[in-house]
Amino acid sequence: EIASCLVGSEMCIRDRLCVKACKKIGYYGVGTFEFLYEDGQFYFIEMNTRVQVEHPVTELITGIDIVKEQISVAAGEKLNYRQEDIIFRGHAIECRINAENPYNFRPSPGIIKSYNVPGGPGVRVDTHLYQGYRIPSQYDSLIAKLCATGHNRETAIAQMRVALSEFMIEGIEHNVPLHCDLLTQSDFVKGQQSIHYLENWLAMRQKK
C-alpha cells in the first residue's frame, strides 16, 4: 500500500536520499528502492531496476503512467516529470490475487469456470484471466492485481473490502478469502503489521 502507514517525516528524508543516489550513479529510468523500517530508523535493502509488481498503487496516487514513462526512457526520450511534479493524492492498496490455497499456499492449477471482477470508481484490476482460461501446473501463481483507492487509508481499506467481496473466481482455489480476513484484523487496520505479521497470524489461526 501507499503511502506507508508506518512512517512520517522520515519518508521525505529517505525519498531525497533516493533521488540523490540515482543522480550519483547516473541511473535513468524506472526503479524501486526497498527499505526496512524499525524504531524510527530505515535500512536500505536493495534497488530493483525495473517496473515492480506493485507499481499500480503508485500510479493511482500520482496519476503517472509508470510503464509508459519506462517505454519512453527506453526509446531515448526524456522523462515527462521532474521530482517536484510528483504529488501523492490519497491512499491506495493492492492485493495480489494468487491461484493457491489461501492458508497453506498450495498451488491450484485448473480451469476458470466462472469469473467476475469488481469495478467502479476507486477500483482497478490488472489481470489476464477470462472464463475458460486454463492455469497450467507450471505457472506463476499471480493471476490478478486488485487495487483500491480512497482519500485516506480508512476509506481505501473500506473500498478494498467491498471490491474483494465482489471478486468471484470459480474452478480453482485462490487467496481472496485470505485478503478478506486480513483486512478485518485490528492490527492491520491500525497499521501495526510487520514483515512477520502474516506468518504469525497464520500460526495463531492454526492454533484456534
Regions found by a protein language model. Give the residues of each.
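Solvent-exposed alpha-helix faces
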Residues: 11, 19, 161-165
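Glycine-rich phosphate-binding loop of ATP-grasp-fold ATP-dependent ligases
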Residues: 9, 32, 55-58
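Secondary-structure transition/capping motifs at alpha-helix termini
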Residues: 23-28, 38-39, 151, 170, ...
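Catalytic cores of soluble metabolic enzymes centered on carboxylation/carboxyl-transfer
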Residues: 56-208
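Conserved metal-phosphate-binding beta-hairpin within the catalytic cores
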Residues: 26-52
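Anionic group-transfer/hydrolysis microenvironments
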Residues: 12, 36, 48, 96-98
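Single conserved hydrophobic/aromatic residue that forms the stacking wall/gate
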Residues: 1-13
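Short amphipathic alpha-helical segments
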Residues: 15-23, 71
